[in-house]
Structure formats: structure tokens, C-alpha cells
Amino acid sequence: MAFGGIGELDDATLAKLFAVNATAPIVMLRESAALIADGGFFVNISGVVATQPVAGMAAYSASKAAAWAAMSSVARELRRRQIDVIDAQPPHTETGLASRAIAGVAPKMPVGLTPDAVAARIVAAIVAGERDLPVEAFAS
């Protein structure tokens, strides 16, 4: 995660965010697509910021949006093999990453979901055959 206005963003931070949040998931999907059995699935967690960007988090939001766009595209490619590419977009989750940002300081945020709650919701979606997990799917 990284926080701060666009004027505070340096190239190294931008590169790190895209490497971790966009390039890595895309490469993992590329490398695993041939290994996933027909009817299988691939899950990525982009988070709510992929489709609902937040002020002061432009680079982080953009990196997550890039992964979301790739997952959406590849989901169409793999549909004929009945492989579900699920991009989960949970709201703020208490992973501790906000307090260990690679740049900037996190604003005060409301208490987020627990990682266990997010994982349970994703597993339930897989079992139920859900293909879309927007932020609303994580509402209690």
C-alpha cells in the first residue's frame, strides 16, 4: 500500500505497486492457466479500490485496477474451458498493511473486515459458483 497525493508519488513506489499488485497476479494467471483443469478456478483479490479509487491512493488504486482489468479479460478467454477467474473486491481488510505502507501514512480508516471473513466469503463464492465478488458481496 502507498498513501499520498499524486505529487508525492515517486517512480520507485509506482513500480513496486505495479509489480506486486498488477504484474505478479497477471504472471501467476498466465503461468497457471494451462495447468488449471477445465471447470477449475483462479482467484485474485484486487479490493474495492480497483473499481472505487480513493483520493490519496491513486497509484495503489491504479495497480489494483490493472489487475482487475486483466482478470476480467482473461475470464472471457477461459470461459470456453469453464474456468472461473474470480476477482474479489473486499472492502478494507485488517491485514496490517496500512500501517506498513511503502510510502506515506494511512489516513484514519474504519475498522475493516478480518482476513478470515474475507477468505470465508471467497470460499463460499467458489462453492456456490459465483463469478463476481464486488464489494457489495462482502456486506454482512
Task: Please name every model-derived segment.
Residues 3, 90-100, 104:
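Short, flexible catalytic-loop segment of classical short-chain dehydrogenase/reductase
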